[in-house]
Regions:
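Phosphate- and other anionic-substrate recognition elements at nucleic-acid/protein interfaces
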Residues: 1-119
Protein backbone atom coordinates (compact mmCIF):
# COMPACT_ATOMS: atom_id res chain seq x y z
CA UNK A 1 0.00 0.00 0.00
CA UNK A 2 1.49 3.31 -1.04
CA UNK A 3 0.86 6.67 0.54
CA UNK A 4 1.90 10.29 0.23
CA UNK A 5 1.35 13.31 2.46
CA UNK A 6 1.12 16.46 0.32
CA UNK A 7 0.68 20.11 1.17
CA UNK A 8 -1.77 22.28 -0.75
CA UNK A 9 1.24 23.68 -2.62
CA UNK A 10 1.92 20.18 -4.05
CA UNK A 11 4.95 19.71 -1.80
CA UNK A 12 5.61 16.13 -0.69
CA UNK A 13 5.92 16.03 3.10
CA UNK A 14 6.19 12.26 3.38
CA UNK A 15 5.67 9.17 1.25
CA UNK A 16 6.26 5.49 1.44
CA UNK A 17 4.97 1.99 1.05
CA UNK A 18 3.57 -0.30 3.70
CA UNK A 19 4.68 -3.86 2.96
CA UNK A 20 2.00 -6.14 4.36
CA UNK A 21 3.64 -9.47 3.52
CA UNK A 22 2.00 -12.76 2.69
CA UNK A 23 2.50 -14.42 6.07
CA UNK A 24 0.49 -11.91 8.09
CA UNK A 25 -3.16 -12.61 8.78
CA UNK A 26 -5.86 -10.36 7.36
CA UNK A 27 -6.48 -8.99 10.86
CA UNK A 28 -2.78 -8.11 11.24
CA UNK A 29 -2.68 -6.43 7.82
CA UNK A 30 -5.82 -4.43 8.57
CA UNK A 31 -4.44 -3.35 11.95
CA UNK A 32 -1.15 -2.30 10.32
CA UNK A 33 -2.98 -0.09 7.81
CA UNK A 34 -5.11 1.48 10.55
CA UNK A 35 -2.07 2.13 12.76
CA UNK A 36 -0.02 3.67 9.94
CA UNK A 37 -2.79 5.97 8.71
CA UNK A 38 -3.60 7.12 12.24
CA UNK A 39 0.09 7.86 12.94
CA UNK A 40 0.52 9.76 9.65
CA UNK A 41 -2.58 11.86 10.36
CA UNK A 42 -1.36 12.75 13.83
CA UNK A 43 2.28 13.34 12.85
CA UNK A 44 1.57 15.56 9.84
CA UNK A 45 -1.66 17.28 10.90
CA UNK A 46 -3.53 15.86 7.91
CA UNK A 47 -6.72 17.79 7.15
CA UNK A 48 -8.15 15.66 4.33
CA UNK A 49 -7.67 12.13 3.02
CA UNK A 50 -7.99 11.24 -0.67
CA UNK A 51 -8.37 7.65 -1.84
CA UNK A 52 -8.85 5.98 -5.17
CA UNK A 53 -12.29 4.39 -5.53
CA UNK A 54 -12.74 0.68 -6.03
CA UNK A 55 -11.83 -0.84 -9.31
CA UNK A 56 -13.04 -4.14 -10.68
CA UNK A 57 -10.80 -7.00 -9.71
CA UNK A 58 -11.00 -10.49 -11.18
CA UNK A 59 -10.10 -12.17 -7.88
CA UNK A 60 -12.92 -11.77 -5.32
CA UNK A 61 -10.57 -12.67 -2.46
CA UNK A 62 -8.14 -9.93 -3.46
CA UNK A 63 -11.03 -7.48 -3.69
CA UNK A 64 -12.12 -8.46 -0.16
CA UNK A 65 -8.60 -7.90 1.20
CA UNK A 66 -8.39 -4.51 -0.51
CA UNK A 67 -11.78 -3.63 0.96
CA UNK A 68 -10.61 -4.41 4.48
CA UNK A 69 -7.51 -2.24 4.14
CA UNK A 70 -9.46 0.64 2.61
CA UNK A 71 -11.94 0.37 5.47
CA UNK A 72 -9.13 0.47 8.02
CA UNK A 73 -7.69 3.62 6.43
CA UNK A 74 -11.11 5.26 6.30
CA UNK A 75 -11.83 4.35 9.93
CA UNK A 76 -8.51 5.81 11.07
CA UNK A 77 -9.35 9.07 9.31
CA UNK A 78 -12.95 9.15 10.55
CA UNK A 79 -11.92 8.57 14.17
CA UNK A 80 -9.60 11.58 13.89
CA UNK A 81 -12.41 13.69 12.40
CA UNK A 82 -10.73 13.85 8.99
CA UNK A 83 -12.95 13.84 5.88
CA UNK A 84 -12.23 11.18 3.25
CA UNK A 85 -12.68 11.97 -0.45
CA UNK A 86 -12.76 9.21 -3.06
CA UNK A 87 -11.77 9.65 -6.69
CA UNK A 88 -12.20 7.31 -9.64
CA UNK A 89 -9.06 5.76 -11.13
CA UNK A 90 -9.70 7.78 -14.31
CA UNK A 91 -9.90 11.05 -12.35
CA UNK A 92 -6.67 10.22 -10.50
CA UNK A 93 -4.86 9.46 -13.76
CA UNK A 94 -6.19 12.64 -15.36
CA UNK A 95 -5.06 14.75 -12.38
CA UNK A 96 -1.59 13.18 -12.28
CA UNK A 97 -0.79 12.64 -15.96
CA UNK A 98 -3.37 14.76 -17.77
CA UNK A 99 -4.90 11.71 -19.47
CA UNK A 100 -7.57 9.51 -17.86
CA UNK A 101 -6.46 6.34 -19.65
CA UNK A 102 -2.78 6.58 -18.69
CA UNK A 103 -0.95 3.37 -17.83
CA UNK A 104 0.33 2.56 -14.35
CA UNK A 105 3.84 3.12 -15.65
CA UNK A 106 2.96 6.62 -16.88
CA UNK A 107 1.38 7.51 -13.53
CA UNK A 108 4.39 6.17 -11.62
CA UNK A 109 6.81 8.10 -13.85
CA UNK A 110 4.90 11.36 -13.41
CA UNK A 111 4.73 10.94 -9.63
CA UNK A 112 8.48 10.26 -9.48
CA UNK A 113 9.16 13.38 -11.56
CA UNK A 114 6.75 15.63 -9.66
CA UNK A 115 7.78 14.63 -6.15
CA UNK A 116 11.43 13.63 -6.71
CA UNK A 117 10.80 10.02 -5.75
CA UNK A 118 13.42 7.32 -6.29
CA UNK A 119 12.96 4.78 -9.09
Amino acid sequence: MGYAILSFQQVRLASGTLKLGKKRSLAEKTAAVFTLVKALIQEHGVQEVAMEEFFYHKDPRALARISHCRGAAMAAAALEGIPVFEYSPMDVKKAVVGYGHATKEQVAWMLRQTFSLPD
